[in-house]
Amino acid sequence: MANRYLHNVQGLFDTIAPNYDRMNNIISLGTHRHWRKQTMAQIHLASNAHVLDLCCGTGDWTIALAKELQAPGEVIGLDFSAPMLKLAQQKVTQQQVADRVWLRRGNAMHLPFKDNTFDLVTIGFGLRNLPDKAQALTEIYRVLKPGARLVCLETSQPDQPLIKPVWQWYFTKVVPLFGRLFAHQYQEYSYLQETTRHFASYQQLATMFQQAGFQNVHFQRFNFGAAAAHFGTKEAK
């Protein structure tokens, strides 16, 4: 069942890849870049770090991380969508960070890396689309070095009574309409709004981090809780 789900979601992202960046800007009204910038400000990345960016999509966060590094530091961007990775490679070349970026196709729930490999793992707007989120967090914990961190930027759910109905209306009605108007992909963006609406709250995601073994778990909310950055540290030995 999980493999079938993953195959279907992969096909969806293969389909929306050509419009992905433009639609992200439209749906978030450009705020996703601000969220990522604020999240990056809390990472304090060493210039020689080895970083894994999961569900890297078209590579925006991968490139932003690479710009903070110098050799031998590097970022591996992993995604299951070949069309997304093709677009990411074009950006990597344009931004002149190809010496610090390696793009790889793979499954975030079964990472093809040894234990204790990375100084940092990031995942942006990808965790909610995985069929087994707990397995993904367990895998991330495995490949992190002791004392290293996971940083997850993801959509969340506002809990303020005046904000939540507006948020639900926007994702239920407006987002699929944007998909139809700007990308001719109503069904695809109907699915994406469902994963957003039904994903864990920021409190629940913090609990999931703790259940996977992460320590010092904390989060920062954006736009009244429409998105949140979560941080967790692997136990230092």
Swiss-Prot record:
Listed pathway(s): Quinol/quinone metabolism; menaquinone biosynthesis; menaquinol from 1,4-dihydroxy-2-naphthoate: step 2/2
Entry binding sites for S-adenosyl-L-methionine: 58, 79, 107-108
EC category: transferase
EC nos: 2.1.1.163
SUPFAM superfamilies registered for this protein in UniProt: S-adenosyl-L-methionine-dependent methyltransferases
Enzymatic reactions: a 2-demethylmenaquinol + S-adenosyl-L-methionine = a menaquinol + S-adenosyl-L-homocysteine + H(+)
Protein's GO biological process: menaquinone biosynthetic process; methylation
InterPro entries for this protein: SAM-dependent_MTases_sf, UbiE/COQ5_MeTrFase, UbiE/COQ5_MeTrFase_CS
Alphabetical keyword list: Menaquinone biosynthesis, Methyltransferase, S-adenosyl-L-methionine, Transferase
Family according to the record: Belongs to the class I-like SAM-binding methyltransferase superfamily. MenG/UbiE family.
Primary role: Methyltransferase required for the conversion of demethylmenaquinol (DMKH2) to menaquinol (MKH2).
Protein name: Demethylmenaquinone methyltransferase
Naturally occurring in which organism (per UniProt): Lactiplantibacillus plantarum (strain ATCC BAA-793 / NCIMB 8826 / WCFS1)
Gene: menG
